[in-house]
């Protein structure tokens, strides 16, 4: 049993637990805000994920930067990976809206660079996405323009860009992935299947190593 008295302000508590530990209990007396619990080993790579389902990725710059800097430094962050753009491809989007969205993504990159100026940023672009055009599934209108706008913004802001769309095979590749046996994409022609997501992960890994 370990007892800590927490002072006002930001605090980090670290426990070094035996490798055979499989459960624990945290009890709190009084009022306290807990922003996160990280379970890590002394070796290997630790990934901290922010799974914002349906998000466009333009909200980071509204988060208190000093608080984020404190978190990232305590986590010893060595790489920031952003993957956004697909949820911004709503029906009826215009080129002007794509331009505005890309500029907003640029602000997010600058936000992270200001917090961790020495940490590289990798932006993963949208995959191919299909829509029904006169009874035929085709790459969504303006998707290529979205990808190009994001690529230019990311690179111009000093971050790395990985083109998922091109890695898949380019235009109408989502249809091909969905029609594979076993399928690498879902029947909605937007999302990957588990097997397809694994394959994309492998392709990204291979790109980084090469």
Name these PLM-found stretches.
Residues 3, 35, 56, 68, ...:
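Short, flexible coil/linker segments at or flanking structured domains
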Residues 45-46, 75-80, 116-121, 156-160:
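Loop/turn elements at helix/coil->beta-strand transitions in domains of secreted/extracellular proteins
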Residues 65, 127-210:
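Catalytic His-Asp segment of secreted/periplasmic serine-dependent ester chemistry enzymes
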Residues 79-85, 102-113, 120-129, 148:
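Conserved, well-ordered alpha-helix/loop/beta-strand core segments that scaffold catalytic motifs
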């Amino acid at each position: 049993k370990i007892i800590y008295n927490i002072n006002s302000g930001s605090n980090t508590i670290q426990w070094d637990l035996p490798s055979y530990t499989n459960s624990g209990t945290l009890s709190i007396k009084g009022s306290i805000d807990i922003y996160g619990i990280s379970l890590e080993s002394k070796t290997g790579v630790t990934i901290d994920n922010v799974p914002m389902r349906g998000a466009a990725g333009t909200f980071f710059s509204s988060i208190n930067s000093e608080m984020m800097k404190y978190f990232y430094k305590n986590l010893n962050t060595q790489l920031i990976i952003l993957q956004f753009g697909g949820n911004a491809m709503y029906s009826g989007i215009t080129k002007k809206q794509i331009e505005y969205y890309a500029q907003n993504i640029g602000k997010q990159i600058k936000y992270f660079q200001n917090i961790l100026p020495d940490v590289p940023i990798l932006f993963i672009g949208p995959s191919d996405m299909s829509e029904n055009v006169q009874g035929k599934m085709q790459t969504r209108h303006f998707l290529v323009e979205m990808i190009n706008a994001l690529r230019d913004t990311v690179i111009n802001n000093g971050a790395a860009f990985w083109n998922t769309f091109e890695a898949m095979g380019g235009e109408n590749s989502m249809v091909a992935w969905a029609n594979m046996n076993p399928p690498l994409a879902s029947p909605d022609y937007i999302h990957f299947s588990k097997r397809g997501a694994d394959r994309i992960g492998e392709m990204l890994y291979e790109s980084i190593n090469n």
